[in-house]
Amino acid sequence: HNLIMCNKANLLNQSAFLLGVPGSGKSFSAKELIAFLILNTADDVLVCDPENEFGALAAALGKETATVIHMAAGGKDRLNAMYMVDGYGENNPIVEKSQFIMSLVEQIDKAGVGPQQKSIIDRCTALVYQDAERTGKPATLCDLRNKLLEQPEEKAKEIALSLELFTTGSLDIFGHESTVDLDKRIVVFDIHGLGEQLKPTGLLVITDTILNRVTLNWKKGKRTHIFIDEFHVVFENEQSGIFF
């Protein structure tokens, strides 16, 4: 019954699972740890919250410290799926982002993405980021869809049609510039309101947003802690499962 304590920063692998039967206090323990990190360190915390469990904690810690992003179809909170920080990915950031967009289109279009579609997506993604660099305006999925419509190939127009629902349609929360503050020390991604149709895409965009924040903090020499409540949810989606 002796208490075993350790500093995760000194371990080879700092990942951890909180396991227990329902009602045993897993989420409470996670909240307690988050509060400790915020009050005693300069680290940042990102939370993926499928059951609307962490909003109250964020509110208690204050608007200067925490923000809750409510992801839901038709909601006012939006995340730019094509946002990319300097140093994104491990190699060429445009190539890395192009692969992410391919995964995103595969989630949207269950028919899959063949070699020709991949070539078109790769080309258009590069063109969109070239335009963004020239104009200083962040690239968005709407820009990508417009660029696809400009291409001569019929398959490009098919991809654009697949993106329509997520850019100008009713599920457009990932198609425009972000409307949320991602710079707070605690960012809670509340995905409770995502329907089954939007959840796979939402998880993919959120994992990419997490990658952006971790990359940015790493360049600053700042630690980032990622908490995933109901972790099995991310494994219901192949791409988010691969990420974690």
Can you describe what each PLM-predicted range is?
Residues 1-71, 244:
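Glycine-rich phosphate-binding loop of nucleotide-binding enzymes
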Residues 3, 52-66, 73-244:
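P-loop NTPase motor domains
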